[in-house]
Amino acid sequence: GLGSLVGNALRIGAKLL
């Protein structure tokens, strides 16, 4: 669901940072 997408985006953002 959306929660999964949001969590995925946060993980990707954390990796970029």
UniProtKB/Swiss-Prot annotation:
Modified sites of kind Leucine amide: 17
Subcellular location: Secreted
Keywords carried by this UniProt record: Amidation, Secreted
GO cellular component: extracellular region
Domain of life: Eukaryota
Tissue specificity remark: Expressed by the skin glands.
Protein name: Caerulein precursor fragment-related peptide BM5
UniProt organism field: Xenopus boumbaensis
